[in-house]
Amino acid sequence: MKKEQVEKRTYLAVDIGASSGRIMKSQRLANGQITIEEIHRFKNGFHQKDGYQRWDMASLVHELLLGLQKVKQLGIKECFIGIDTWGVDYCLLDQSGQLLDEPIAYRDGRTEAAVTNFSKGYSLEKLYQQTGIQVQPFNTIFQLFVEEKERLAAASQLLLIPDYLGYVFTGKAVIEATNASTTQLLNAGTKQWESELLDFLGIDETLFPTLVEPGTILGDLQTAAFPDYDLPNATLITIASHDTASAILGTPGIGDDWAYISSGTWSLLGIETTVTTISAEAFQENYTNEWGAQNTIRFLKNIMGMWLIQEVARHQNYQYSYAELAALAEKEPAFQQFIDVNDPRFLNPGNMITELQAYCRETQQTVPESPGELARCIYDNLALCYSVELEKLAQLTGIERKITTLHVVGGGSNNRLLNQLTADVANVTVNAGPGEAIALGNLLMQMIATGELKDIPAARTCIQTSFPTEIYQANPIDSTIKNRYQAFMKRSSL
């Protein structure tokens, strides 16, 4: 293809999170840089139906079609599309290939006792040794453990959320491997479905379609199936469809002295490596080995993240923006309370404000009352948690290299207070941005698939030259604060 034709290739990243989704358009310029532009944004969320919290897949499909229609109206007649979403949730198809019912959201309470009950018949240590994935009650394996047997019996196929959307648009059913690793059903060594786990669940392997790697050409958008929409000609590419996998691919890390935090509803803190770390210590610390693009491993810890402040803002009826909450927090004294940000009680409480206050009351601490105090409590403790986990990361992997740079990407990278706190508490340089790392990772994987970019290092160089980042140098805090925090965490775990 001629150079001028390559420059005009249009790529679309469909990036859907728990609360919103968007379609981002990108092209690669002659100077090697890439552009990125939001074309369509829409709300997402789960709703109560038939006793469960569910995702509205029909609404998501409709919004994506509206966005693609906007793309066509911009004069773009041909494009490539990649889809990423959150992990672990799944759609069940009936014998005719239609959705059995709306998929149940991972925050639904149905799996509250799943880990305990599962462990009565299957060792959690063995589960970790087989899969390398941290034990979390909402993982696909535990959702399937509590799934209604009648629904499973009626299902012909199981598709993860991005794969279902790809199936709707192309008619091709696959499961993308990086996202499949979050199911906790794949063997870390063989990279195939673990038959012993499937037997324990009473599930046949035929329920799962073919596993494919990121960069696989899925197929063309079946425009004839959507006559009510004026759509462009599009080719779907299966990218690293778990949003964290795309975010890390979209992180501008060079060399081997860096770690990352993909900062959004969850904070995913880890390193990129090529080997799994499956040990008794990693199991105890609940670290995970999720698969990444091009044979990489994301060894990371899931931390509750911006969910805490999102829920505080929601229960204040969004009286304050996130920037305003951070500004209020900055005026408050630091480290007045210690909390375990990963305590399960914060996963989906009725009211995050009262839950945080109850936690502080129960642990005989000063109770945060004002919006600024609540925000300060959250940001201080996220920074403390990040710092402790960075140390554990080095210990668990036995890495000789010193982590000198922490790349913070995603929406949370815009939080200047938290970035500086993290640099200070962890005593590392924080490199914040790009905020659009998920969409960028999605887009760049497409460009690798089409041959516009050679590999992941080339993609990251492209990010560095295209998007500025903000550097936060460390002003180390009094070490006794961190010592007190760690002592508190040790007591609270007893």
Curated annotation (Swiss-Prot):
Binding site for ATP: 18-22, 265, 310, 411
Alphabetic keyword roster: ATP-binding, Disulfide bond, Kinase, Magnesium, Nucleotide-binding, Rhamnose metabolism, Transferase
Matching CDD domains: ASKHA_NBD_FGGY_RhaB-like (cd07771)
Gene Ontology BP annotations: glycerol metabolic process; rhamnose catabolic process
Gene Ontology MF annotations: ATP binding; glycerol kinase activity; rhamnulokinase activity
Pathway annotation: Carbohydrate degradation; L-rhamnose degradation; glycerone phosphate from L-rhamnose: step 2/3
EC numbers for this chain: 2.7.1.5
Catalytic activity: L-rhamnulose + ATP = L-rhamnulose 1-phosphate + ADP + H(+)
Name assigned to this protein: Rhamnulokinase
The organism of origin for this protein: Enterococcus faecalis (strain ATCC 700802 / V583)
